[in-house]
């Protein structure tokens, strides 16, 4: 979630070598020639892959049969605050037990999830003896703690998700710097070095390396970057020139070790991507990780979410589609998209970061219009961004009654809508594609309409 939301919602190994003058080394005695003993071949890497292998092909995520795959999931993070205070005091076994129990409950409740966005929560990797600088900042990162809990907590949780049929998208600890003492990120800054270190460690882990069940989202919500012109921003060509350099170096670091699918973030809290169409991230198995909240992209919102990139106004479907086409469309035309944060619910519930309604596709509201845009794009995976696994586990597929709705059963809130939409996706009911024909009965004059990014 955005750094503005962080108060409420979730928001380097070195090998040493010594050198000396060879002339100072003692002369070794000659050894009579003997047949060389064949060297043992290195043991092949164990294959931890369990789910159908996915890869990026053009603008699509595909399986080995060449079929397009769009994933639908949810999120988990691992700190007492976001785990309903069900455990405390770095009790790792209780953390594992609680979160596995939540996964079991979510599956039993009938949710049709096939991926999870897993936060490698800084609760575990922070060195709390260091001074606090910012919420979920990288400044207190301990490589020793990170390696320990990657082994003992995060990888075991990833394996558990995979055993339940879910791919895992790992997100690095914390959020990108933006507020004081920072203005944003900058090529060569300490945050880039932090990300390089994190992904160097993760991409070499024996149970993660080349395990295509596990993917990587490179960073959470970059806001502004220092451009080649020296100015901080999120939309200019100069900013995207440096965004390409910034994230390409991390992609290259990962590719030194493995081929796992990578999801690259944009700028502007992961809402701005157009510049990547010119300054392309190079390599295979690369898509883009997008965030989408009510009020962003010109969409409808009951209340502005406060990042400064949206509003509480909106005109229903058409402005939303135009905003999506402008800000995300240029990369959706060349690579798959994964929306790794999205939610909505009426303001009265105060239960989600985004305040809006499901509404109707083509009309007012946020949720149904987003689904329509994603379905017509044909290459958008997305999820329910939640820090409340216990609510998903408690979900009952029993309709509420008007006047007595709750957050979980109100059709205008995202849980009810997503629960049923994701079941439809899993059953193959929803067909992605553009409309084939549109008739306006009784119309003689020419009309210009926009649907799914296409003008008619």
Regions found by a protein language model. Give the residues of each.
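Short aromatic/hydrophobic helix-turn
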Residues: 176-177, 223
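Single conserved hydrophobic/aromatic residue that forms the stacking wall/gate
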Residues: 1-12
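A mature extracytoplasmic/lumenal domain signature
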Residues: 75, 120-122, 172-174, 220, ...
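N-terminal structural segment of carbohydrate-active enzymes
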Residues: 43-136
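Extracellular glycoside hydrolase catalytic/binding regions
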Residues: 51-54, 78, 82-95, 183-215, ...
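Aromatic-lined substrate-binding rim segments of carbohydrate-active enzymes
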Residues: 95-176, 194-195, 251-258, 354, ...
């Amino acid at each position: 979630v955005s750094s503005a939301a962080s108060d409420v919602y979730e928001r380097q190994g070195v090998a040493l070598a010594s050198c000396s003058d060879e002339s100072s080394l003692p002369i070794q005695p000659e050894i009579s020639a003997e047949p060389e003993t064949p060297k043992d071949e290195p043991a092949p890497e164990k294959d931890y892959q369990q789910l159908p292998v996915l890869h990026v092909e053009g603008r699509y995520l595909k399986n080995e049969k060449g079929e397009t795959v769009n994933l639908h999931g949810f999120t988990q993070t691992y700190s007492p605050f976001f785990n309903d205070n069900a455990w405390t005091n770095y009790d790792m076994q209780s953390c594992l037990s609680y979160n596995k129990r939540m996964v079991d409950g979510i599956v039993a409740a009938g949710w049709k999830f096939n991926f999870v966005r897993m936060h490698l929560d800084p609760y575990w990797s922070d060195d709390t003896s260091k001074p606090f600088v910012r919420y979920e900042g990288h400044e207190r990162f301990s490589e020793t703690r990170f390696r320990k809990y990657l082994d003992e907590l995060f990888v075991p949780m990833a394996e558990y998700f995979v055993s339940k049929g879910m791919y895992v998208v790992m997100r690095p600890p914390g959020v990108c710097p933006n507020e004081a003492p920072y203005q944003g990120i900058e090529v060569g800054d300490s945050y880039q070095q932090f990300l390089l270190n994190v992904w160097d460690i993760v991409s070499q882990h024996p149970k993660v390396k080349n395990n295509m069940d596990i993917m990587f989202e490179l960073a959470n919500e970059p806001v502004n970057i220092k451009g080649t012109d020296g100015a901080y921003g999120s939309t200019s060509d100069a900013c995207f020139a440096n965004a390409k350099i910034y994230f390409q170096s991390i992609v290259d670091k990962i590719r030194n070790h493995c081929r796992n699918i990578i999801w690259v973030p944009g700028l502007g809290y992961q809402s701005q991507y157009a510049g990547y169409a010119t300054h392309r991230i190079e390599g295979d198995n690369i898509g883009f990780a997008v965030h989408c909240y009510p009020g962003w992209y010109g969409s409808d919102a009951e209340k502005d979410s406060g990042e400064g990139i949206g509003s509480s106004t909106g005109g229903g479907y058409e402005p939303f589609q135009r905003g999506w086409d402008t800000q995300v469309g240029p990369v959706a035309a060349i690579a798959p998209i994964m929306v790794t944060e999205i939610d909505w619910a009426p303001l009265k519930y105060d239960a989600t970061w985004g305040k809006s309604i499901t509404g109707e596709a083509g009309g007012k509201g946020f949720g149904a219009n987003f689904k329509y845009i994603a379905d017509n794009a044909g290459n958008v995976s997305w999820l329910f961004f939640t820090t409340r696994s216990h609510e998903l586990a408690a979900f009952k597929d029993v309709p509420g009654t008007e006047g007595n709705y709750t957050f979980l059963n109100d059709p205008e809130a995202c849980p009810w809508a997503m629960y049923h939409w994701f079941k439809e996706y899993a059953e193959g009911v929803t067909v992605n594609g553009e409309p084939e024909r549109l008739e306006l009965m009784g119309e003689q004059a020419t009309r210009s309409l926009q649907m799914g990014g296409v003008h008619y």
